[in-house]
């Protein structure tokens, strides 16, 4: 479980639609995007400053609570939702620079090919898989929010690149 630092003094209730529009959209089973207006009302009516988001998924509920000035404790069974939440709700303005992106998308540092070997013929082109292997070779040396932000960016890019959703696999959609 990760503690998301407080956003400072409690801000006025945020506009849930604005929060949803700012938050990176991820097609995720059980996503709470549609519930944000109701969750905002409930959180606004509750006393206290701490919100638990035990099944954080896309992280949008944690982000909403954070924008409302709440301290957030977020967790998930899977690792990637925790990374998404740390990169968004726990990120105090860190952004990847152009140099970071050039490094991340640059040459493979150590020749790793696990992703290419394991996922060949599934979901992505060989070129896409090689980019992911290369990015992971760079990420091995990165730490903290910068690393979380880079991984979150790769997760979101991969989710958009695979338009059929994360639970469909193998063959191209149209011959």
Name every feature range the model reports, one short phrase each:
Residues 1-55, 60-67, 91:
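S-adenosyl-L-methionine
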Residues 71-175:
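Class I S-adenosyl-L-methionine-dependent methyltransferase module
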């Amino acid at each position: 479980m990760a503690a998301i630092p407080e956003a400072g003094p409690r801000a006025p209730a945020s506009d849930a639609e604005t929060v949803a529009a700012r938050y990176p959209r991820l097609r995720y089973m059980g996503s709470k995007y549609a519930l944000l207006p109701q969750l905002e009302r409930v959180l606004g009516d509750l006393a206290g400053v701490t919100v638990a988001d035990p099944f954080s998924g896309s992280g949008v509920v944690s982000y909403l609570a954070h924008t409302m000035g709440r301290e957030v404790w977020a967790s998930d069974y899977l690792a990637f939702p925790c990374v998404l939440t740390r990169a968004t709700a726990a990120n105090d303005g860190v952004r990847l620079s152009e140099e970071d992106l050039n490094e991340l998308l640059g040459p493979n540092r150590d020749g790793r090919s696990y992703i290419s070997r394991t996922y060949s013929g599934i979901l992505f082109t060989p070129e896409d898989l090689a980019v992911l292997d290369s990015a992971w070779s760079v990420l091995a040396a990165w730490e903290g929010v910068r690393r979380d932000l880079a991984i979150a960016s790769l997760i979101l890019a991969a989710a958009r690149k695979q338009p059929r959703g994360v639970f469909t696999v193998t063959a191209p959609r149209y011959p």
